[in-house]
Amino acid sequence: MGAGLVASLLAGTATGLGALPVLVTSELSRKAQGPDVGLQRGRDAGGQSFSLVIPAMELVRGQGHDGPSAALRVAAGVLLGGLFLRVWHDLMPHEHALKGHEGHGGTKWNSALLFVLAMTLHNFPEGLAVGVSFAAPQPELGLSVALGIGAQNIPEGLVVALALRASGASASRAAFLALLTGMVEPVGALFGVLALSLSSALLPWGLAFAGGAMLYVISHEMIPESHRGGFEREATTGLMWGFVLALVLDMSLG
């Protein structure tokens, strides 16, 4: 339990580390932001596949299920994770650079606060993934997930801080709020750890749930954001490299 929480805290802190350059610059071209966000999403997509869904399938088989029975259990976990994020997305007020205000209420809230709330939608499932993966029998699984998420949190922190600067926040406030978005990850990890404390048999469900939640965020939020400004090719190149990074981490540590 402790290892997962500490790892998620360190991974979340990487967001603040990535935000530090905002103290000396307030601009990053959209062309550069495309591959940056694409890299993050590629790593998420790879991590969702290699470190969450595939281990969930192996664990379900280890519990004596096979064929359609195993597939249905993992599929149900993935769909439940996506549904959880969809409901949260529809209820919580937040704001995106591309799509503007979304969620229920909060239309008069400060735009910086709404943007921070939007990032909690991204970071909660990442923390959940770290917490759940550290409960797996293979200790290297949790390390792979935490390192991958921590690595992609660094450029994400810069993108978040620059967006906050563009909305009018001071450099120090932008860096602090970017760090704050990363602190949602230990909350997600705690959520996963507490759920799994009920029964170890829930582990494959937890891995699949975290994978589904991340998949929802990748498709619904981050890929559209990375394609804004007409730099789809650069964003897709970044996504491919991020996916390869996740593959290398998983195979090197596994």
UniProtKB/Swiss-Prot annotation:
Zn(2+) 1 binds at E126, Q152, E156. Keywords: Cell inner membrane, Cell membrane, Membrane, Metal-binding, Transmembrane, Transmembrane helix, Zinc. It is found in: Cell inner membrane. The chain crosses the membrane at residues 4-24, 74-94, 112-132, 143-163, 176-196, 198-218, 234-254. GO terms for molecular function: metal ion binding; zinc ion transmembrane transporter activity. Its main location: membrane. One of its GO terms (cellular component) is plasma membrane. It is a multi-pass membrane protein. It comes from the Bacteria. Zn(2+) 2 binds at N123, E126, N153, E156, E185. It holds the Pfam family Zip. Belongs to the ZIP transporter (TC 2.A.5) family. Homodimer. Mediates the uptake of Zn(2+). This is Zinc transporter GufA. The gene is gufA.
